[in-house]
UniProtKB/Swiss-Prot annotation:
The protein's name in its UniProt record: Phosphoglucosamine mutase
CDD domains attached to this UniProt entry: GlmM (cd05802)
Lineage: Bacteria, Bacillati, Actinomycetota, Actinomycetes, Micrococcales
Entry-linked PANTHER family: PHOSPHOGLUCOMUTASE (ALPHA-D-GLUCOSE-1,6-BISPHOSPHATE-DEPENDENT), PHOSPHOHEXOSE MUTASE
Documented EC number(s): 5.4.2.10
UniProt PTM: Activated by phosphorylation.
Phosphoprotein among keywords: yes
GO terms for cellular component: cytosol
Cofactor, how bound (note): Binds 1 Mg(2+) ion per subunit.
Record's function text: Catalyzes the conversion of glucosamine-6-phosphate to glucosamine-1-phosphate.
Cofactor(s) this protein requires: Mg(2+)
Amino acid sequence: MSRLFGTDGVRGLANGLLTAELALQLAQAAAVVLGHDRNSNGSRPRAVVARDPRASGEFIAAAVEAGLSSSGIDVYDAGVLPTPAAAYLVADLEADFGVMISASHNPAPDNGIKFFARGGQKLPDDVEDAIEAQMHNEAVRPIGPDVGRIQRFSDAEDRYVVHLLSTLPHRLEGLTVVLDCAHGAASGCSPQVFKDAGADVIVIGADPDGLNINDGVGSTHLGPLKEAVLQYGADLGIAHDGDADRCLAVDHEGNEVDGDQIMAVLAVALKEAGKLNDDVLVATVMSNLGLKIALRDAGISIRETAVGDRYVLESMREGGFNLGGEQSGHVIFSDHATTGDGLLTGLQLAAQVALTGKSLKDLAAVMTKLPQVLINVKGVDRTKVKSSDVLAQAVKAAEAALGETGRVLLRPSGTEPVVRVMVEAADEETAQSIAEHLAQVVRTELALELISE
């Protein structure tokens, strides 16, 4: 039987995989695993529950809150809120755990449930496994005064906004910023915090109706943001995804500024301020080689991890580093947050534009992105990537040809018969040529063997 929890909680089609019954069972199990200890004063354990504005979030939240409260957990219902805001509130309220109902950048029919431990930390695999195992046991059913209560938490958004403002190194007066909120969870608080920080704000993608989240807007569809930045002559644009745990940007000329470039700008700024722990940035193996070259020139090292913000977080915790992230725009400031925070990232980026007086285009020029070609080779035996001598020799020859001006990365899929071939080079033509050659070697050498009857 496959594992219920994926890389970011439980996610699937609402009323398909993710039913009200499953949400109730998950909550009952989490109540036992995460809220089994009463607080020191004898009070019931407490949990924060928040969601993005998907229509299905209402019934899933109701099921989660029923499962928690019927298991003896007091619930703070924070309503519609970004994922990083939910994590922050778990820590700020000293709650025992938190639940976020969202499918992030997925389309509206999907939804998901993920949990935060005390302090707003993501759960390790073994705790998720314990929750899944507990689902097969009898639910805990307290009676009388031991049942949990549900409290509507009306100032959740305001608390989060005050926290974000407290992190700013410089106010944003004089800046015009376009915000694309993806018709998602940040539709209320992102415009509010940028206005409170002093910026002139133009807002798009901030009219959620439960069905339009991520629909042609947000960080996965930057076209509308680019158009708005040019139309209004804005200094920059900021795009969130549905639950606002990521941020991509657009400069005043409409050029995309991705997660790697954002991290380069912020890492250099933190180092110059003496606030970048050990002068290290944590990034994944998929970050552009141009990031490593730029930061090396700035005296900053990169600690590489596997793809996924959970691996970035693990490395940051282990090494005591305070900045990390992914090319996709998940950026983590561990001095201020326990997870990727698109609002925090956007504010910090805008603050650098205001503080330095430079355009975002000029700031992002600290890094030169190398052309990157990615080919997904399907229908191959992904388990043989490291055992094929012919493939190893082909990779070695490609790396020798690229020298220090490029790199090769082969990544087998974790679930499908697919191998991803990624090549970076000084020019697009070279990257494409080498990637296509290696993809052909993968097709030939890792071809799936046909089983004859």
